[in-house]
A protein has these predicted regions:
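Nucleotide-activated sugar donor-binding and catalytic core shared by glycosyltransferases
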Residues: 1-208
Length: 208
C-alpha cells in the first residue's frame, strides 16, 4: 500500500537528505505529497534536517520553471507537485510513473525503492531487465541512477544525487527522448507510456 511505502522509504530518504545537507548546507528540501498520506508524511518528516517544505495536493495556478526560486512554496506550501518538480535542482523519487512526471519537468532524478524481503526475492527471480525506471526503459538508456531493494541505502543514493547537482545536464537527452516518444501520435498518454515501456522491455531482452 502507499502507506507501507511511506513507512519503508521515508527513513531511507531521511538518511539521504541528512547526508546531502551536510555536504550542501544551503539545500532546501521539498516533499510533495498526496491527500491519502499527507498527514503521515507531515508527521514523519517533522524532525528531518533542513525543515522540509511540504507541498500538499492543492493545485497551484502558476507555472514554474527552474529559473524561479522556492520562495512561493515556502510561503504557501499549497502548490502542486508539478510546480515543485519544475523548481527543483534534483529529485529523489520512488520508482514508478513519477519518473515520467520528473522528465516532463526536466528535473534530474535519482530513483530509489525498497520492498519487503519476500517481495525482493520473488521480483529478483522474475525480473528480466536491468532497470525498472520508466525513463531508462522508454529512452533505451541507463542514465537515471536507481537503487532498488538491498541497494536502497543512503550511502549509495547520496553520491548519485551529488553527481547530478554537479552535472544537471547529464539526463537531459534521455528525458527529451522520453517525452518525444510519449508525445507522438494521437494515442492517449497512458497507452503511449505502456507501449513505449513494452518496446523498451523488448529491446532490453533482445526481442524485436
Amino acid at each position: 500500500s502507499r502507506r507501507s511505502e511511506v513507512r519503508r522509504l521515508l527513513p531511507i530518504f531521511r538518511g539521504a537528505v541528512a547526508a546531502l545537507i551536510r555536504q550542501h548546507p544551503a539545500l532546501r528540501v521539498v516533499v510533495p505529497t498526496v491527500s491519502a498520506v499527507e498527514s503521515q508524511v507531515r508527521t514523519t518528516v517533522a524532525d528531518w534536517p533542513g525543515k522540509p517544505i511540504i507541498v500538499g495536493p492543492k493545485a497551484a495556478t502558476a507555472t514554474w520553471t527552474h529559473t524561479q526560486t522556492l520562495a512561493h512554496l515556502v510561503e504557501t506550501a499549497h502548490s502542486d507537485k508539478r510546480a515543485a518538480f519544475a523548481a527543483a535542482d534534483v529529485a529523489l523519487a520512488a520508482s514508478g510513473t513519477v519518473s515520467l512526471e520528473l522528465a516532463a519537468a526536466a528535473t534530474p532524478m535519482v530513483i530509489a525503492y525498497d520492498m519487503a524481503w519476500l517481495s525482493r526475492q520473488i521480483i529478483s527471480r522474475m525480473l528480466r531487465v536491468d532497470t525498472v525506471t520508466l525513463v531508462n526503459l522508454v529512452s533505451e538508456t541507463r542514465v537515471v541512477p536507481e537503487f532498488i531493494g538491498a541497494n536502497c541505502r543512503p550511502d549509495k543514493i547520496v553520491p548519485a544525487l551529488c553527481a547530478l547537482l554537479s552535472n544537471p545536464e547529464a539526463q537531459h537527452s534521455a528525458m527529451q527522448r522520453t517525452m518525444a516518444k510519449l508525445g507522438q501520435g494521437g494515442t492517449k498518454p497512458g497507452i503511449r507510456a505502456a507501449q513505449a515501456t513494452l518496446s523498451g522491455l523488448g529491446a532490453s531482452n533482445g526481442e524485436g
